[in-house]
Amino acid sequence: MKEYITVIGGGLAGSEAAYQIAKREIKVKLYEMKPDKFSPAHSNTNLAEIVCSNSFKSNLHTNACGLLKEELRMLDSLLIKTADEVAVPAGQALAVDRERFSQEITKKLESLENVEIIRKEVGKSGDRNTETNFLESKDNNDEIKSMPTEMENSKSTKENNIECGVEQKDVISLEQLSKDGIVIIATGPLTSDALSWEIVKLTGDEGLHFYDAAAPIIEKESIDMSIAFWGDRYSQERGKDEDVETWQERIKNSNENNYINLPMNKEEYEKFWNELVKAEVVELHNFEKREIFEGCMPIEVMAKRGIDTLRYGPLKPVGFTDPRTGKRPYAIVQLRQDNSEGNLFNMVGFQTNLKYGEQKRVFSLIPGLQNADFAKYGVMHRNTFINSPELLDETYNLKKNRNIFFAGQITGVEGYVESIASGLVAALNSVEMYERLNREEQSRTNIKTTNMSRKGLSLMRQITFPKETMIGALSKYIASENKNFQPMNANFGILPELPERIKDKKLKYGKLADRALDKLSGILQ
């Protein structure tokens, strides 16, 4: 067994993981491909580089991300502590000087005796023809037709060296690093092609997605059920020879509650359509445009093909009867359950690239969603992430290879703080595994770490957090069964409901936050 834990990726999750391991007096080898190679979005050589907004969102406990940050402060997160130190004025939000932030994280990790930072790319491409053919034929639920290649958009230092006659050093493979050792993969949404290929081989054909094209997710209790109704297409519809009373009794007693349906009349639909086609969209990066739009069309783009296009697509009303009128609606929007608790619903077919404010404005025009609370807005961007519900448990541990953990956005958590949280959880559990295996090895039980089975480590103590905490709820979300899994950020919709119903949203979120912090305090004492 190797006398260290390997972390691949020096972003937010990987940097947090390396710190948490090192502070527990275990050696860490942290692999970072910069400056040897840069992704299309990265530009400096420091660890924990922030490439988008410099905001870590609200500090208020009545905000889901604010609660998550407070939990991480209680758990001695290096990155949140550093963010607090280099904060810039931002009202109630935590915003940072991005250059100072990444510089400080790099300096602190370099100063730790137990951390060795290795500036090399990890990943073995193998036969490029085989790889290309495989990935071009790969179809993840009709969402991806080919693997995006960052080589088309950026050129590595390594490639330039080859052209100048400088010898290229071989990259290190994931297979090599994980042999008889524990590995955390924290390579983010722009994971390199070579490592992506190894992850595909590790997780299987359906294990890896290359972009995020997600519809908005809505909190169920904010849906107006005096307008919306339950039912599946065709079975909910009133039969030609079925009288109204019989039909109403049938649908009332029906167990087919897979969808919440939002009916629209002609006037409502045309008002919605007019606002949708003129709404503002997010400008995509050049490297994102090709792969996203060839695999999944945004609803606003589809709408611009004609006023009735949506009515023959995701908003087709065939197979439904509006309980209020007894007639087929002019158009219908369907919501599908998104989590096992049944308190989050996604908008079917509403993958979108609209700005967040525009999503709130336009989608609230849909009858039944006039007061909707959006747990997550729709997004379309390059985002490499694994099918976590199939592959990981709540500790971010790979089920079929127990010596491998994942952390960060590659697991399907979305956001800076969420990535940090996942890195912390993965690190704590990798330490637990390391110490257990080290004890076993010392007692000569000859337990190997490569390709560990769940059975082989059935006695391994796992470090999980209460589901009432935000850090625990995120871990549970990515590990829970979900046939339509999409990345998720911190939001109060993923927490268990309070025993009492509270209409005042601020009061409700305050009580959820108090409960979370009490639960976390309880296990830390």
List where the protein language model places each region.
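An active-site-proximal "capping" alpha-helix that borders the catalytic cofactor pocket
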Residues: 419-433
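C-terminal auxiliary extensions adjacent to catalytic cores
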Residues: 485-525
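N-terminal FAD cofactor-binding segment of flavoenzymes
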Residues: 19-80
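A glycine-rich dinucleotide-binding beta-alpha-beta segment and adjacent secondary-structure elements
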Residues: 346-413, 420-421, 463-476, 487, ...
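Helical element adjacent to the flavin cofactor pocket in flavoenzyme catalytic cores
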Residues: 98-117
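Active-site-proximal substrate-binding core of FAD-dependent oxidoreductases
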Residues: 431-438, 446, 451-488
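Predominantly flavin-linked oxidoreductase catalytic cores and closely associated redox partners
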Residues: 115-128, 166-335, 349-356, 360
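Beta1/beta-strand and adjacent pyrophosphate-binding region of the FAD-binding site
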Residues: 2-13
